[in-house]
Amino acid sequence: MKNLLLMTLLVLSSFSISAKQILLGPNSNSQEEIQEALIDLEPGDVLTLEPGEYFFEDGISLDVDDVIFEGSGIDDTILHFGDQVSGAQGLLVTSDGVTLRDFAVLDAKGDAIKVIGADGISMIRLRTEWTGGPKETNGAYGFYPVESKDVLIDGCVAIGASDAGIYVGQSQNIIVKNSIAQYNVAGIEIENSYYADVFDNLASHNTGGILVFDLPDLPQQGGHHVRVFRNKAINNDTDNFAPEGNIVGEVPRGTGIIIQANSDVEVFDNDIYGNGTVNLSIVTYGYETDDENYNPHPKSIQIHNNRFGDGGFDPDVGTGELAAILFELSGGDMPDIFWDGILPMNQILFGQPDDEKLVISNNGDATFLTLNPIKYLLPFFDPVERDIKEYEGQVRPLPEVILN
């Protein structure tokens, strides 16, 4: 036992002795110095940037496991990419166990911070921003971890992305918390991902506040087990400025939360108001696809104990189809919660399994609208249903996400 303890202490001691802390300040050669330092890091090292402004003409990248890359504060260490001429990202991370914290990435040519294939990535107190306001020439994503596991985004700020400010795609075990997303097309988006907790965030002045999407033709699909709670999805009022062809280009201005084609999603204890088209929508993926493995229908969605306020007062009927269809169906009396009512044909005929049914419970005076698909297909019937009480049911809380 003593020998084992001694060996452990020796290993820890050698690790701490070999780990380095590198401190760099701004100068005319910052691009080369920082990239060289990122290449030369070894596991356990910490690279710290002093307060100041750092200017880049190329993207920078990190491919070393178990390191920390940090600045001296979200408003104090500023990485400027406004003159970037090469690289699809400001910062690209392709390694495991990395922590990024306490700096800002401004005006990247493409995505601000992209992480690919990481087993453990922590982004803490970071800011990504395009400083010229909402424009389709802005980069697509602020925070962009994809194909990763154990993703933490905590205390971050995302402003001005032409797709999503905070986006996590094709990943699993995800926490997005204590963050602010403003003036993006999508504020926060969880796409084709498994086990995500999104909580204590502010999503405001975006086109759409919080999106939980699942799309076809991707290696990982069938998004499931997403909890959205204690957020403020409020006052999302920015015109859609996504480049033509982007899926989020269909999101109407004034959308609080959209759930599309996911299963096992729990939305609770949120403040949702000030969204001019609709506060919350649950919709089927509406495009044809040749992907035989893809299920376009949302199921096992639970909406409970939220606080809804004014919504639907300025529907964006000119963007996509959602707002125009909803406006027509509702006669202009837009609901707080909308479900398109579309089900697989066998469920239209024989009913949904109980554990897949939509549950809406304890949302105050929230209003509701859905379609009866059979009545919608037949003439002389009103397909619109508004009785929210029919969807009261037993809430089955989803498990908390715990990162490894």
Residue ranges and their predicted role:
Residues E288, N293-N404:
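Acidic, glycine- and Ser/Thr-rich low-complexity intrinsically disordered tracts
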Residues L9-S18:
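Hydrophobic h-region of N-terminal signal peptides that target proteins for export
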Residues E70-D75, D96-D107, D119-G132, K149-S162, ...:
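Right-handed parallel beta-helix
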Residues E32-D40, F55-V64, F69, K114-G117, ...:
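Short, T/G/N/S-enriched strand-turn elements that build extracellular solenoid repeat scaffolds
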Residues K20-E32, V46, D66-K109, G132:
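Right-handed parallel beta-helix/beta-spiral solenoid domain characteristic of secreted/periplasmic
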Residues K2-T8:
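Sec-dependent signal peptide recognition
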Residues Q31-I34, E57, F81-L91, D107-K114, ...:
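Extracellular beta-strand/beta-solenoid scaffold signature
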